[in-house]
From Swiss-Prot:
One BP term from GO: isoleucine transport
Signal as UniProt keyword: yes
Region forming the signal peptide: 1-23
Domain of life per record: Bacteria
Species classification: Bacteria, Pseudomonadati, Pseudomonadota, Gammaproteobacteria, Enterobacterales
UniProtKB keywords: Amino-acid transport, Disulfide bond, Periplasm, Signal, Transport
Disulphide-bonded residues: C76-C101
The protein's name in its UniProt record: Leucine-specific-binding protein
GO cellular component: ATP-binding cassette (ABC) transporter complex, substrate-binding subunit-containing; membrane; outer membrane-bounded periplasmic space
Protein task: This protein is a component of the leucine-specific transport system, which is one of the two periplasmic binding protein-dependent transport systems of the high-affinity transport of the branched-chain amino acids in E.coli.
């Protein structure tokens, strides 16, 4: 009996120690597209989050506690995003890095706000997200209201086209950016011949290409993602159309070159700066390459910065309450791989720079002149 009692007591102690160890893990939901047409953007996000968590834990974690990433796939689909958000609530996770697409982030954010969960999005750029008075929603990405004017300024001052078409994919991200560019161009009395939408996932753009030729369009701005832009470029060049194309960071992806081939050469794209070329980030670049991950994608770094920001607030406050972390970040900012970040009361960054780049057929890019 005594031996059995000792065994039971030892088992109870081991179980208690096990539960204590489990309690020391700080779970962080990482949500993005593992599937769907823009899963490659999700790859950037997950790679950035994984590397950030790995690096933070290697330095001792949060006061000795480890960050644990729990990954979810929303496919950049609004309905799936809502299901994922509810799953995160049921899983008892207090912090979310994600979502990536504006169209999936906004409905998910309603749930996080209601449940008091902190969400830091590294990719949702639509301004509406943070204009609803929510207290638990932040982002490390710049806004369409900044990226759009950057594109418009370059179009007006450098390209100086005569006849412009603006096209979008009818989604929150793409249409929002297209309207922002249109506003900038119209304010300067530029000749925007037409503004029209296509359907995301569409592959046959023969009617659109014919319209561009008929209207003598010499410049196209497309608000959307790389699958459609790649098809547009390939089909336009196949019929001899030499119109200049431009898009946002959603088109700046190596997969675009796989779709468009040589037709990708010379496309213009607005993107964040190349954080992988910052000497201060060389150690992270080397670690990513050693793990056979591409360090060049912007969302690798913007997501890494989102995780860093969360970790900074957890370490600095010693609190696990989401609202306390939000208040700390808004008051004190965070130093990250993309530079020092400071947020306004809405949860938007006070400054985020976009540049204009020229895309090349091999999937690389260089600063546009």
């Amino acid at each position: 009996m005594k031996r059995n009692a000792k065994t039971i007591i030892a088992g109870m102690i081991a179980l208690a120690i096990s539960h204590t160890a489990m309690a020391d893990d700080i779970k962080v939901a990482v949500v993005g597209a593992m599937s769907g047409p823009i899963a490659q953007w999700g790859d950037m996000e997950f790679n950035g989050a994984r590397q950030a968590i790995k690096d933070i834990n290697a330095k001792g974690g949060i006061k000795g506690d480890k960050l644990v990433g729990v990954e979810y796939d929303d496919a950049c689909d609004p309905k799936q995003a809502v299901a994922v958000a509810n799953k995160i609530v049921n899983d008892g996770i207090k912090y979310v890095i994600g979502h990536l697409c504006s169209s999936s982030t906004q409905p998910a954010s309603d749930i996080y706000e209601d449940e008091g969960i902190l969400m830091i999005s590294p990719g949702a750029t639509n301004p509406e997200l943070t204009q609803r008075g929510y207290q638990h929603i932040m982002r490390t990405a710049g806004l369409d209201s900044s990226q759009g004017p950057t594109a418009a300024k370059y179009i007006l001052e450098t390209v100086k086209p005569q006849r412009i078409a603006i096209i979008h994919d009818k989604q929150q991200y793409g249409e929002g950016l297209a309207r922002s560019v249109q506003d900038g161009l119209k304010a300067a009395n530029a000749n925007v011949v037409f503004f029209d939408g296509i359907t995301a996932g569409e592959k046959d753009f023969s009617a659109l290409i014919a319209r561009l030729k008929k209207e003598n369009i010499d410049f196209v701005y497309y608000g959307g993602y790389y699958p459609e832009m790649g098809q547009m470029l390939r089909q336009a060049r196949s019929v001899g159309l030499k119109t200049q194309f431009m898009g946002p960071e959603g088109v700046g992806n190596a997969s675009l070159s796989n779709i468009a081939g040589d037709a990708a050469e010379g496309m213009l794209v607005t993107m964040p700066k190349r954080y992988d070329q910052d000497p201060a980030n060389q150690g992270i670049v080397d670690a990513l390459k050693a793990d056979k991950k591409d360090p060049s994608g912007p969302y690798v770094w913007i997501t890494y910065a989102a995780v860093q920001s969360l970790a900074t607030a957890l370490e600095r406050t010693g609190s696990d309450e989401p609202l306390a972390l939000v208040k700390d970040l808004k008051a004190n900012g965070a130093n990250t791989v993309i530079g020092p970040l400071n947020w306004d009361e809405k949860g938007d960054l006070k400054g985020f720079d976009f540049g204009v780049f020229q895309w090349h057929a091999d999937g690389s890019s260089t600063a546009a002149k």
